Amino acid sequence: MPGGKKVAGGGSSGATPTSAAATAPSGVRRLETSEGTSAQRDEEPEEEGEEDLRDGGVPFFVNRGGLPVDEATWERMWKHVAKIHPDGEKVAQRIRGATDLPKIPIPSVPTFQPSTPVPERLEAVQRYIRELQYNHTGTQFFEIKKSRPLTGLMDLAKEMTKEALPIKCLEAVILGIYLTNSMPTLERFPISFKTYFSGNYFRHIVLGVNFAGRYGALGMSRREDLMYKPPAFRTLSELVLDFEAAYGRCWHVLKKVKLGQSVSHDPHSVEQIEWKHSVLDVERLGRDDFRKELERHARDMRLKIGKGTGPPSPTKDRKKDVSSPQRAQSSPHRRNSRSERRPSGDKKTSEPKAMPDLNGYQIRV
């Protein structure tokens, strides 16, 4: 996975440890602090795809055997459900022993008329993601390797629409990319969050979007204000700070934000998604610098698209699009440089659009 620029600078928040910048072999700019090894140890397991195989201190599993789920994975899932659910084994036995479980309807993949406005399309995409429901089992059904080329991830997203199984946040990001490939005027980029609550770290990811200069997000969460945001935020910093406020309402403290680069609209692209172009340490940066770095990242994305190295409007027709829900034009542009990395900030909060409550029984997000 390509490295990005990590920003963990001083800022204005109280006493900050003395630090000196050092360049890691991967090209990620690291800051060595007096906390030294503990700070670096905290960095190593940060992989949103599997959340370090822990979700707020609670282990969770990934189905690596594909579908249909093999018996060993199936039994492990139910054993884990019995362990983490408040009703323990009773709930697993009640579901597995039932003979009259209702048939779950399969949501329809959204389709659009050419005249349908992009904001309405985004609402439909989010509604579809929401209808798949959040996966509370503790076993992620689709294995997502973030280093896979985009074309492989789009094939996986297509499989998600066929299976219509509950998903977690990273799966929702891949699905969101797939379902918006036919919207060339919509910029898409990953936004990852690391928060702290009650002695544990939690990780979450959404798909940031930018349409007509307004920012929003698509995603999946146990909490309605940590996924969908309509494209109504004037700046990237407003969007991120709105997520931070949502975290604050469930007593989570935002620790880090990772911002990726714009994702190509070409479902057949062999390039990888750039997940961590900017890594921002919220505490060390301080409020003003945090906003500045967020806005710098937004400028980087605009400049990259302006230079023709990002995903602009598609220019080439494809007769058959096997990895997109609709037949659409696809972008042949490839990003030329993965080493041009800088992060981006500004503040204001906007009312998020109300979504149905996911009503999780845990405070994990």
From Swiss-Prot:
Post-translational modification (record): 2 major forms (42 and 36 kDa) and 2 minors (32 and 27 kDa) may be processed by proteolytic cleavage. The largest form (42 kDa) seems to be secreted and the other major form (63 kDa) seems to accumulate within the cells or pericellular milieu. Polypeptide consisting of Met-77 to Arg-318 may correspond to the 27 kDa form and that consisting of Met-77 to Val-365 may correspond to the 36 kDa form.
Region ranges (Involved in heparin-binding and antiangiogenic activity): 319-365
State which Enzyme Commission number(s) the record gives: 3.4.17.17
Q: Where is the composition biased (Gly residues)?
A: 1-13
Q: Where is this site: Cleavage?
A: 29-30, 76-77
UniProt catalytic activity: C-terminal L-alpha-aminoacyl-L-glutamyl-L-glutamyl-L-tyrosyl-[tubulin] + H2O = C-terminal L-alpha-aminoacyl-L-glutamyl-L-glutamyl-[tubulin] + L-tyrosine
Q: Which residues form a coiled coil?
A: none
**So what does mutating residue 145 to A/E actually do?**
Reduced tyrosine carboxypeptidase activity on alpha-tubulin
Record keywords: DNA damage included?
Answer: no
Tissue-wise, where is it found?
Preferentially expressed in endothelial cells. Highly expressed in fetal organs. Expressed in brain and placenta, and at lower level in heart and kidney. Highly detected in microvessels endothelial cells of atherosclerotic lesions.
Q: What is its main location?
A: cytoplasm
Ranges for region Disordered = 1-59, 299-365
Record's compositionally biased regions (Acidic residues) = 43-53
Q: Which InterPro entries match?
A: VASH1
Bias (Low complexity): 14-27
Effect recorded for residue 168 to E: Abolished tyrosine carboxypeptidase activity on alpha-tubulin
Cite a single GO MF annotation: actin binding
Please list the residues that make up the active site.
169, 204, 221
Chain intervals with Basic and acidic residues compositional bias: 337-351
Q: Where is the signal peptide?
A: none
A GO cellular component annotation here is: endoplasmic reticulum
Disulfide pairs here are none
Q: Which PANTHER family match?
A: TUBULINYL-TYR CARBOXYPEPTIDASE 1 (PTHR15750:SF5), VASOHIBIN-1-LIKE ISOFORM X2 (PTHR15750)
Which family does this protein fall into? Belongs to the transglutaminase-like superfamily. Vasohibin family.
Give the protein's function: Tyrosine carboxypeptidase that removes the C-terminal tyrosine residue of alpha-tubulin, thereby regulating microtubule dynamics and function. Critical for spindle function and accurate chromosome segregation during mitosis since microtubule detyronisation regulates mitotic spindle length and postioning. Acts as an angiogenesis inhibitor: inhibits migration, proliferation and network formation by endothelial cells as well as angiogenesis. This inhibitory effect is selective to endothelial cells as it does not affect the migration of smooth muscle cells or fibroblasts.
Name listed for the protein in its UniProt record: Tubulinyl-Tyr carboxypeptidase 1
Q: Which organism is it from?
A: Homo sapiens (Human)
Instruction: From the UniProt record, report the name of the gene that encodes this protein.
Output: VASH1
